[in-house]
Swiss-Prot record:
Function: Catalyzes the transfer of a dimethylallyl group onto the adenine at position 37 in tRNAs that read codons beginning with uridine, leading to the formation of N6-(dimethylallyl)adenosine (i(6)A).
ATP-binding found in the keyword field: yes
Gene3D superfamilies in the record: 1.10.20.140, Crystal structure of tRNA isopentenylpyrophosphate transferase (bh2366) domain, P-loop containing nucleotide triphosphate hydrolases
Protein name, per record: tRNA dimethylallyltransferase
Cofactor: Mg(2+)
Span list, region Interaction with substrate tRNA: 42-45, 166-170, 247-252
Organism expressing this protein natively: Salmonella paratyphi C (strain RKS4594)
Assembly mode: Monomer.
Keywords, in A-Z order: ATP-binding, Magnesium, Nucleotide-binding, Transferase, tRNA processing
Residues reported in the UniProt entry to bind ATP: 17-24
InterPro entries, sorted: Dimethylallyltransferase (IPR039657), IPT (IPR018022), P-loop_NTPase (IPR027417)
Site feature: Interaction with substrate tRNA: 108, 130
C-alpha cells in the first residue's frame, strides 16, 4: 500500500511493552488529552475473577478510562488470537464510527501481530482427529507425541512444551488435517489491518530497572490479596493447570503452592522468575518489531509528551 492510500485510512495507536512497564498508566494519561478509546491487548486480562495477579486496572482507573475486551471470558474458557482479532476489529470499527481513535494497549505481542498482519488460514478443529490424538496420548503419553511433533515440525516443537497438551494437540491436528506444518501455515499471513497505525513501545532503559519493577509489583500483588484470589479459583473445582488461564504467569506458581507442591518462598521466587521470562520474551518480540517508537518508563511525563507530538496532529 502506498503512502497516499495509507493516509486515507482511519487512525489507530498501538501502545506495547513488557509487563510492569507502565503501559496502563500512560494509556489512561493519554485518554485525558486525546480523543481515544482504550482496547486491552492482553491474554490474561480477558478473564473474569483474575484481577490482582493480572494487574487489571482498578475500578477508579476503569471509571476514568474504560478498557474494552476486559472480563470477556470465564477462566474455564479458551480464547485464541483469531478470537481477539475478530473482537478487536469490531471494537475498532465502533470507536472509529463514533469519531474517536482506537488506542490498543497491552503486552500480548501475538495478538498485536495477528491484528496488524492478519492470521494464516489454519484448518478448523476436527473432533475425529483430535480424539485420535488424545487416544494416542493416553496410550503413549504426551512426551511421545512431542517427539512425533519434533520430527514433523521441529520449529513448533521447540516452542511448545511437552506439558502443554492443548497446543501440542493442535500442532499435530493441523498437520494431520492439512498435510502442512503449523510453522509453514503461520508464515502465510491473512488480511493486513486496514488502519494507519502509530506504534509505540514503553520500557525502562535497562533490564535491571525492569527486573526491579517486576519484583516490586509481584510483592504488591501478594500484599493486595493475590493468594486469596487464586484460592477462590482453586475452590471452584473445575479449573486446572492445562487451562490457559491457570497457566498465566503468577497463577501457575501460586496454584503449585496451594496444591502443596512448593513452599511459599519458592512460589514467590518462581513467580518473579516467570514474570522476568515473560518480559524477556516480550522484549525479544519488540526489538524485532518494525516501525515502533520507544518511550522510557522512568520518565512518564516525557513519554506522554512524545506520544502527543506524534499523535497530536492526527487528533485534531
Amino acid at each position: 500500500m502506498n503512502d497516499v492510500s495509507k493516509a486515507s485510512l482511519p487512525k489507530a495507536i498501538f501502545l506495547m511493552g513488557p509487563t510492569a512497564s507502565g503501559k496502563t498508566a500512560l494509556a489512561i494519561a493519554l485518554r485525558k488529552v486525546l480523543p481515544v478509546e482504550l482496547i486491552s491487548v492482553d491474554s490474561a486480562l480477558i478473564y473474569r475473577g483474575m484481577d490482582i495477579g493480572t494487574a487489571k486496572p482498578n475500578a477508579d482507573e476503569l471509571k476514568a478510562a474504560p478498557h474494552r475486551l476486559l472480563d470477556i471470558r470465564d477462566p474455564s474458557q479458551a480464547y485464541s488470537a483469531a478470537d481477539f482479532r475478530r473482537d478487536a476489529l469490531a471494537q475498532m470499527a465502533e470507536i472509529t464510527a463514533a469519531g474517536r481513535i482506537p488506542l490498543l494497549v497491552g503486552g500480548t505481542m501475538l495478538y498485536f501481530k495477528a491484528l496488524l498482519e492478519g492470521l494464516s488460514p489454519l484448518p478448523s478443529a476436527d473432533p475425529e482427529v483430535r480424539s485420535r490424538i488424545e487416544q494416542q496420548a493416553a496410550e503413549l503419553g504426551w512426551e511421545a507425541l512431542h517427539q512425533q511433533l519434533q520430527e514433523i515440525d521441529p520449529v513448533a516443537a521447540a516452542r511448545i512444551h511437552p506439558n502443554d497438551p492443548q497446543r501440542l494437540s493442535r500442532a499435530l491436528e493441523v498437520f494431520f488435517i492439512s498435510g502442512k506444518t503449523l510453522t509453514e501455515l503461520t508464515q502465510t499471513s491473512g488480511d493486513a489491518l486496514p488502519y494507519q497505525v502509530h506504534q509505540f513501545a514503553i520500557a525502562p532503559a535497562s533490564r535491571e530497572l525492569l527486573h526491579q519493577r517486576i519484583e516490586l509489583r509481584f510483592h504488591q500483588m501478594l500484599a493486595s490479596g493475590f493468594e486469596a484470589e487464586v484460592r477462590a479459583l482453586f475452590a471452584r473445582g473445575d479449573l486446572h493447570t492445562d487451562l490457559p488461564s491457570i497457566r498465566c504467569v503468577g497463577y501457575r506458581q501460586m496454584w503449585s503452592y496451594i496444591e502443596g507442591e512448593i513452599s511459599y518462598d519458592e512460589m514467590v521466587y518462581r513467580g518473579v522468575c516467570a514474570t522476568r521470562q515473560l518480559a524477556k520474551r516480550q522484549m525479544t518480540w519488540l526489538r524485532g518489531w518494525e516501525g515502533v517508537r520507544w518511550l522510557d518508563s522512568e520518565n512518564p511525563d516525557r513519554a506522554r509528551k512524545e506520544v502527543l507530538q506524534v499523535v497530536g496532529a492526527i487528533a485534531d
